[in-house]
Amino acid sequence: MLEVPDHDMNFENFDYSFWEEHVNYFNLKTLELILLNNNFRIIHHETTLYSGKAIIVFAEKNKNKLKFSISSNDNFIKIKNYQKQFNTFKKQLETFLKKFKKNIYVYGCGARSCNFVNLIGIGKYISGFVDDNKNKQNKYVPDSNLKIFSSNQVNLDDSVILLGVNAENENAIIKKTNSKNIYSILPPSTRLPDFWKILIEKNKFKK
């Protein structure tokens, strides 16, 4: 049995956050090819949703060498569209952030949120990170050099909050503030900014 993150979710949701610990990313097709190349056949697979989408596969070793052909057209189309939409996504996110005349904080200083800020290059619009982990507080995020605050050090009620936590933890943070401007930057989430949701819907049925 194997369980790996399903990168199809990144393609589908234009999620440009990455875990630097993950050397390889898979979807069902590429995982199947890796297994076939090592003479394993998938006998069952399913997906689950927790902090993102994951693929679970059950595979068995074949006694005889398996024959297979590689067809990567579907993956190629997904990758090209994901790449093509990057600049559009970046510009729309910058436009979205520029409209606010308040401090903007990313709540949750984890690997995905830090990499998202750095890879998209939006550090200049962000006032800092907020995190409840005391070991992170009053330190600085590599590259963006943004300070990490505790929730008591900033006025969250009068700020824009970008949720950089897993969807299942969002409500716990929302209860801490009366801010009217709370958005997620980590799919899957119902709190993504509208421009992001529109981008997802417009590209949902592209082949």
Model segments located where?
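Generic beta-strand/beta-sheet core signal
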Residues: 2-5, 45, 107
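Short, glycine-/aromatic-enriched active-site segment of Class I SAM-dependent methyltransferases
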Residues: 2-24, 28-32
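Extended interfacial segments that mediate partner engagement and assembly in macromolecular machines
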Residues: 14, 19, 24, 44, ...
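Structural beta-strand/beta-sheet cores of well-ordered domains, especially the beta-sheet scaffolds
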Residues: 24, 38, 53-57, 102
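Hydrophobic C-terminal alpha-helix "anchor/cap" residues
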Residues: 34-35, 177
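Hydrophobic, well-ordered beta-alpha structural blocks that scaffold small-molecule cofactor pockets
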Residues: 56-207
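Conserved S-adenosyl-L-methionine
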Residues: 40-51
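Long hydrophobic segments that form regular secondary structure
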Residues: 8, 35, 44-45, 60
